[in-house]
Design a protein with these regions (language model features):
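N-terminal nicking endonuclease/strand-transfer module with a His-rich metal-binding environment
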Residues: 1-171
C-alpha cells in the first residue's frame, strides 16, 4: 500500500529550510534523487528555492515558530509486482498533483522523487517540503490536519491503483 507520512518534527531552527531542502534534493549512499520540482518559489536551483521560502517569511515577519512541514508519500512501501519504472512514472505525475494542490492553497513547496534501495527492491517515494505560511495573506497555515487529509483524499481519488492507506500517518 502507498502511504502519506507527515514528519512530526518541530522544524523551528533558522536553518531548517536550508537543511531540509538540501536533504531531499541530494543523492545519498542508498538513495538517488530522480526529479525535483518546485511550486511558488524560484526554481532556478536549490539556493533560489530556499531563499524564496525564507524571503516570503521575512516579508511578513513570520520567521519564528514552525518554518516548514515535511511530508513523505511512499509509493508501495513494500515489495510488490509493480515495476520500478511504473512507480517512477506514477511518482512524476503525483509530484505535479501535490505541488499544484499546495499552490492552489497559496503554499510554496519543493518536492523530490527518490528511489531508495531496500534489500533487493526499490522504495520509490516523494519528499515534500511546504512553507508554513500562506503566500497571499502571510498568515501561518492553520488546520494542517484538514489540509493533509484533503491531500490524501485527492491522492486516493486520482490514483486508486496505488491503494493509499486511508489515513495520514504522523511519524
Amino acid at each position: 500500500m502507498a502511504k502519506l507520512i507527515v514528519e512530526n518534527q518541530a522544524y523551528t531552527n533558522e536553518d531548517c529550510i536550508h537543511n531540509l531542502i538540501n536533504y531531499i534534493t541530494t543523492d545519498k549512499e542508498t538513495s538517488r534523487v530522480l526529479m525535483v520540482e518546485s511550486f511558488g518559489v524560484n526554481p532556478l536551483n536549490k539556493e533560489t528555492m530556499i531563499s524564496s521560502m525564507i524571503r516570503a517569511k521575512e516579508r511578513v515577519n513570520r520567521t519564528n515558530g514552525k518554518q516548514v512541514y515535511h511530508l513523505i508519500i511512499s509509493i508501495y512501501r513494500t515489495k510488490n509486482s509493480m515495476s520500478n519504472e511504473q512507480k517512477i512514472t506514477y511518482g512524476k505525475n503525483i509530484i505535479y498533483d501535490i505541488g499544484n494542490y499546495f499552490l492552489d492553497h497559496n503554499i510554496q513547496s519543493v518536492l523530490a522523487l527518490q528511489s531508495e534501495k531496500e534489500c533487493n527492491w526499490d522504495n520509490v517515494h516523494i519528499h515534500c517540503v511546504i512553507n508554513s505560511i500562506d503566500m497571499q495573506t502571510g498568515l501561518k497555515i492553520t488546520n494542517t490536519a484538514s489540509l493533509f487529509k484533503n491531500l490524501l483524499s485527492m491522492l486516493i481519488k486520482e490514483y486508486p491503483f496505488l491503494r493509499m492507506e486511508p489515513y495520514v500517518t504522523y511519524d
